[in-house]
């Protein structure tokens, strides 16, 4: 027995050293990844992307609830309706850059995309788990746009659809239509990876990439946030178009049935399940989605014309900049 004790001790020491080395490697890997995997574009990179396509782009910032928010937009023509794109997780406004450069969309509307709280340049790595608070942080853009009396259509993907739906619930006077891509609407009807819990543990949370931290915080609180929204689905009265890949394994297709059950007061609901596609339909089904967005604009305009509610302007420390005072390429 005594013969095996030193051998066991050596084995345990080797195991301990191996685990420590793996832990340190994971920490170093996370810190390196944080610098190179951010899914965002700086102002200069954004301007260069559109300059390469010989298209103008504007970049704006505003402050709300102790946070600076960034958004990008193609133009601010009062004669056109507005489309605001809201990205999922992890991501940023650059997720929709191919939509903002689409010539058909640019002709039809003013195109805006916002960095959600915790992503891009809206407090990168500082997540806001409350869907209601995120909606409130994005709402100032809509208040400013509605001052010129024009319809606003929200186009959102994945987690961003939860935000868009909450905005239609809480700010019915500001939203005139929804286009939801790979929607995450039903509590618990999405895949959560076990690694999300590990990464948010005490041992790893401080060293994981900031972008992943924002996504994990949202993921682990998403069910609770969606449950809090259950009483308010009846408040959505705008026209809604729903797209999802029939083979989506990240957001379960049961969300489509949930949408049909809950959006009973929507003026119109069209659900499209795309065969052979998974979660990333915003990229793979863009030729289908872009015409659908354009077709939603007259419906949003009709809804806007019928709406007679007053808009109350919130307190802002900065407002939508004029095109002449914003960087342009």
Give, region by region, the residue ranges found by the protein language model.
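An N-terminal hydrophobic leader/cap segment in hydrolases
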Residues: 16-61
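The serine-hydrolase catalytic nucleophile loop
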Residues: 89-101
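Conserved alpha/beta-hydrolase
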Residues: 104-123
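Short beta-strand/loop motif that positions the catalytic acidic residue
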Residues: 236, 242-244
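Conserved alpha/beta-hydrolase "acid-adjacent" motif
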Residues: 249-255
